[in-house]
C-alpha cells in the first residue's frame, strides 16, 4: 500500500512487544512492499499504535485485524523490518478526496 501511495506516512517509532495485525482485505501482504510471497518475519508495532481502540486493528488500513502481519523475505534481507513501527498514520489524499466527493454529492453508506 505505502509503496504505491507515496503520501502515506509510517509511524516509525521504536517497536514494542505488540504484534501487528492485518484485515481480510490485506491478509497475506507484506506491510512494506505489498508482495504476497514468502512471509518471513513477524511485524512488531509500537505501544502507541496498539493502545485502546487501536488494539487488534489492521496495520495498513485500520480495519479489524484477523491475522498476524509479516514482512516478506526480501524486506527482511534488506533490513526494512528494522526501520521502526510500520503502522500507517495518515489517511492519504485518495481516501480524503473520496470522502469529500461522497459528501459533496450526498452518497451515504447503508449498513
UniProtKB/Swiss-Prot annotation:
One of its GO terms (molecular function) is RNA binding. GO terms for cellular component: catalytic step 2 spliceosome; precatalytic spliceosome; U2 snRNP. InterPro entries: PHF5 (IPR005345). Coiled coil: none annotated. It comes from the Eukaryota. GO terms for biological process: mRNA splicing, via spliceosome. Belongs to the PHF5 family. PANTHER family: PHD FINGER-LIKE DOMAIN-CONTAINING PROTEIN 5A. This is PHD finger-like domain-containing protein 5A. It comes from Drosophila melanogaster (Fruit fly).
